[in-house]
Amino acid sequence: YEINIDSIFNYLIKGDGNMSILSVNHLSKKINNKIILKNISFSLNEGHIVGLVGANGAGKTSLMKVILGYSDYQEGNFTSIRQDENHCNIGALIENPGLYPFMSGYDNLKLLNESNSTGPINKIVDDLKMNKYIHNKVKTYSLGMKQKLGIAIAFLNSPKLIILDEPMNGLDPKAVRDVRQLILNKAKEGSTFLISSHILSELVKITDSTLIIDKGKIIQEVTREELEQDEEQDLENVLLDIIDKEE
């Protein structure tokens, strides 16, 4: 019997890909009797990249805020990888990330760096090609620069679960490419992703599967393979067809 050392190493580093990092069960939320989230259930396995796609106001950000503990809910439950006393296992980019405008981008990262070394900061700055402006004050940054800094913060301490709300907003095509590659690389190392967008085509190249959300409800989960079968169609029309069938 031949032992595959590479397989054993990958298992020890990443696990077998079946470990549940996040499990959401029948989650519901209301505000003043208005349904925000309705009976949502799904799970994320280790190393997987899952998209969350829907129109503006469909419930994407609300769901992410509940999972991150920024918002309450009335029914259901969820379990996620536990926070370690000395390590943050969850990284997040949510709308309007809290950046310190009168500090440099580098100093913003230093505040949140768990390592005694600046190596992790320099690595993420290189990966996102932020070197030219990382030492400038954040108040001078464009929208795209701030977005990349928010993404850098989410990735900084190599969390096991990374939740990204509309990460491609404000990014030029080169930056989108860099972020996609970073996501794919981190997933290979074992990080798990939940990534939202209102544009299906933004995510299809990197996600293992995509959850379609409409009016606070998950109406369908589609795999990358299923979407690739529709590659001759406009993916946004595919998304609209899925939503229309539910109405």
How should each PLM-predicted stretch be described?
Residues 53-55:
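The feature captures the beta-strand-to-loop junction immediately N-terminal to the Walker
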Residues 110, 118-134:
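Conserved ABC ATPase "signature" region
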Residues 22-24, 37:
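Conserved structural motif at the start of ABC-family nucleotide-binding domains
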Residues 162-166:
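Catalytic Walker B motif of ABC-type/P-loop ATPase nucleotide-binding domains
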Residues 68:
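Helix-to-loop junction immediately C-terminal to a conserved catalytic motif
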